[in-house]
Regions:
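Alpha-helix capping/helix-boundary segments
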Residues: 168-171, 231-232
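Secretory-pathway glycan-assembly enzymes, especially type II membrane glycosyltransferases
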Residues: 2-161, 172
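Catalytic lobes of large eukaryotic enzymes
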Residues: 150, 160, 170-198
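A donor-sugar binding/catalytic signature common to diverse glycosyltransferases
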Residues: 12, 17, 21, 212-255
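Short beta-strand scaffold positions
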Residues: 164-166, 227-228
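Short active-site oxyanion
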Residues: 158-162, 222-225
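Donor nucleotide-activated moiety binding/catalytic core segment of transferases
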Residues: 185-222
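Leloir-type glycosyltransferase catalytic cores
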Residues: 62, 251-263
Length: 263
């Protein structure tokens, strides 16, 4: 059997995940079984570990005596068009199996959220420096005040609870102060200022990956999400085709790069 070996990178978790899932399509087009090996990433505790297998079941079996392995250099990012959301959803459903212990944690949070929860993803910290990595100025974070205005509008129409996913301690405090016990969130590593969680903070790398994966999966099971430009929220949209969203970078800055998921 011939395999396509898909490696990791030093990018953030869902940048790496998005590229990996996109590369499953390359495997299909070449009639190869994908084999994912995430080594020397930001999320392995040991450089010899396969971090993919911390979080997901391996996509295919591998027998070094029988299998021929082809390496794919880099990742395949699908184009920004509506069919990409449908195709990413198909690839996730076909190839991605989240570890049961992680699914159990997600299910517990979703149960506590009740019916039709509102998801809010507020990406701050090093996202303020996104222009240094090739993003436009319009991709910088939207203010918490504007997020709160959109949350208020949504909560006027329902008594839903709010799941907040954020990398920023100050954002967490501001949202708790405003919405009290309607806010549910996870216990995870958060930062302040412009410090990146995955580049600048110490801590268990494996846990950092699990925490952002749980955030994404819970967001994907909400009724509607309020988001900015981020692969975390984008992948939540890929996971669930029924999920709707408000992209505040698009609404307030005309940054339409992720509008294809709403087409």
């Amino acid at each position: 059997m011939s395999k396509l070996l898909i490696g990791g990178s030093t990018a953030g978790f869902f940048s790496m995940f998005r590229g990996t899932v996109g590369t499953f399509l390359i495997a299909e087009q070449n009639e190869l079984d994908p084999l994912v090996v995430w080594q020397e990433t930001l999320y392995d505790n040991n450089k010899f570990d396969n971090a993919w297998e911390y979080y997901f079941e391996q996509v295919s079996d591998y027998d070094m005596r029988k299998d021929r392995v082809h390496r794919y250099s880099g990742h395949n990012i699908l184009p920004r068009e509506y069919n990409t959301r449908v195709e990413m959803n198909r690839l996730i459903n076909k190839y991605v199996r989240v570890k049961q212990e992680i699914e159990d944690k997600v299910s517990h949070i979703v149960s506590d959220l009740g019916e039709n929860p509102l998801g809010v993803h507020i990406r701050m910290t090093d996202k303020h420096n996104c222009t240094k990595h090739g993003e436009p100025e319009t991709g910088k974070p939207i203010s918490v005040k504007l997020y709160q205005e959109h949350v208020d509008e949504n909560l006027e129409q329902s008594d839903s609870k709010v799941f907040l996913a954020t990398d920023d301690l100050d954002v967490l405090e501001a949202m708790k102060e405003r919405y009290g016990n309607r806010i549910l969130t996870t216990e995870c590593i958060r930062s302040t200022g412009y410090k990146s969680i995955h580049h600048d903070l110490e801590g268990n790398n494996r846990e950092k990956g699990e925490q952002v994966l749980i955030d994404c999966l819970v967001l994907s099971r909400c009724k509607h999400i309020i988001k900015g430009i981020s692969n975390v929220a984008l992948c939540a949209m890929f996971w669930n085709l029924d999920l709707t969203c408000e992209n505040l970078n698009s609404i307030h800055r005309n940054d339409t790069r992720e509008d294809f998921v709403n087409a």
